[in-house]
Amino acid sequence: AHLIYIRYLSGNIMKRLLFILVFIYTTASFSQNALYKSDAFTIMPDKVLQGKFMAEAKSAKEINSNFISSYTKPSATKISFKFSIDGRDNENVTGTDHLYILTPVNGKDTTPVYVFGKPDPVNYSSYPSHFLNENTELLLKLDMRNILSEIKEKGYYKCFDGSRITKKNFKGVYIAGGIPPLSWDFEKLPSLKNSKMEDSDGDGIYEIKLHFNTTYTPSEEFKTLWKLKNNISSYPSYSSPQRLVDALYNMSIEEMIADIREDGAFMAGIKWPGVWTRDVSYSIILSLAIVNPDASKASLMAKVKNGKIIEDTGTGGSWPVSSDRMVWALAAWEIYNVTGDKDWLKKCYCIIKKSSEDDMLTVQDKETGLFKGESSFLDWREQTYPDWMDPKDIHSSKNLGTNAVHYKTYLILAEMAKLLNEPSETYTAAAERIKEGINKYLWMEDKGYYSQFLYGRNFFTVSPKSEALGEALSVIYGVSDKEKSDRVISNTPVTKFGIPCVYPQRPGVPPYHNDAVWPFVEAYWAWAAAQTGNVKSAEKSIASIYRAAALFLTNKENFVSTTGDYLGTEINSDRQLWSVGGNLACVYRVFFGMSFNNDKISFNPLVPEAYAGIR
């Protein structure tokens, strides 16, 4: 039995949603049974168990974890680093790093003298890198005489970014880098014991001794505790018989707050301080339009230039090789459906319409009706594309997820046009042609799911790979009919720790999009599974998200699909925005089954039996 009570604290259902939901799911089973159990891990109402590791929710405001990664990586002889004054990234523009090749003799090595803000004394970029064959003590030297002289003569040193270092605020010189004992976390450099350089004889040449081992664990700062610090009472609250779920919900709300920048927009994560079109859009669609429509609006408007949507970087630079920017339209529509803001509707309609006109001229393939361009969010060519494919090949390919986004975009344009008394038929026809093209050219009958993309040069063929995000979007947005939707959820390959971005994997390619699970993709998969009524699939996806967030004590960007470890992927970040949105979506999109339309809110809850109780 489902019983839902709703109280809106604002007069209009489509204004900012501040509500209390009470959801009762009655069943014979109750709370001390496992929520999910597999050979790899178990989710209990208050804890996660994985081998010798356990994460336990002591309350809805505290989680303890003893997870320590066993992942180690061989150290390379080529190291990259930057110098820092006062623990800020103020030596050079992002991406301009120093290089050195470790060449130890009896375990010791000394660098030539580097100069702050200047090119390397030796151009090491073309030197081959090997694995370090002995633990090494490196004496690294930095010439700061020009900077110190400038501060003495002018009273300040002007950094590349325009900031000034004065004698009064000059606190110290630090080194940042990617291999332990170095760290790229500039803000923490002053507190790290292996980062401050010293000028012991006062000659202006700073030195530091660094110890590099033959193998290393990429991050040695393993968390053991999350405890709620911020007041989150102004956001929708959630409570249930599952203490772990309550704590993860609260942790996600807190991380969402931490991801709000000074300008009111969302950053993509701790390591990604910028506003990214696809990151904020997918996050907004999942749950952030519901939780924080104001920051969602600010984020989307930060990605508009000259009245058009900005495409994120990707293969070939950006648009039109990457062409998934229209996910912005889906997020904008979600905000309108949640808030009912007519001014927002009018503004976004003009932006989406203008952007779509460029896409139809430049990106749409007239023969198939599909839109060309890179896989949505899979924007690192080597990770998911064959070696022979260069940017022009990727531009000419037709991807599942990107086309699902375009399909929904034109449905949205048609709906917006109707609400604004504008012609809508062209948009409806465009959407239908995309849907027809996806089902005609990308459906793999023998596998029971869609192909990642059509690719080729003179002749195009179907890639045998699945693509988790595209499969999920096709189900959620109705590209697939009921029969195909059921088959997609039942047949798309899933690993023991979750659904990988693509399947099969590229051998020899390090995990990132390849051989990796991304919690936000997992959340879309859970949403799609719930929409088809596939309880087992939804249960597994929710468990995948909760396992990682609890053990790692943050909503990580990704983790390795074969090990379940967040170490081992090429890049990873804490409190990744779309992972935060995905965690919250387990509550909003699955347990409550919430969906918003321009005139109503609907509930179609899917609550696995193990999650029974009042929430």
Predicted regions: what they are:
Residues T495, Y524, A528-R615:
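Non-catalytic C-terminal accessory modules of carbohydrate-active enzymes
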Residues Q32-K78, I85-P104, Y156-T214:
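Aromatic-rich carbohydrate-binding modules that target alpha-glucans
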Residues A1-A34:
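Bacterial Sec-dependent N-terminal signal peptides
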Residues L21, Y235-G274, A295-W319, Q364-K398, ...:
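Extended glycan-interaction surfaces of carbohydrate-active proteins
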Residues Y235-D246, S287-L300, I335-K353, E367, ...:
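Structural helix-adjacent loops and short alpha-helical linkers that scaffold large soluble proteins
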Residues G274-V280, I284-S375, D379, N399-Y407, ...:
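Aromatic-rich carbohydrate-recognition surfaces in CAZymes
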Residues Y216-P273, N337, K342-W344, Y349, ...:
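Acidic/polar, glycine-enriched structural segments that form the non-catalytic walls/loops
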Residues L400-L442, D446:
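Active-site neighborhood of glycoside hydrolase catalytic domains
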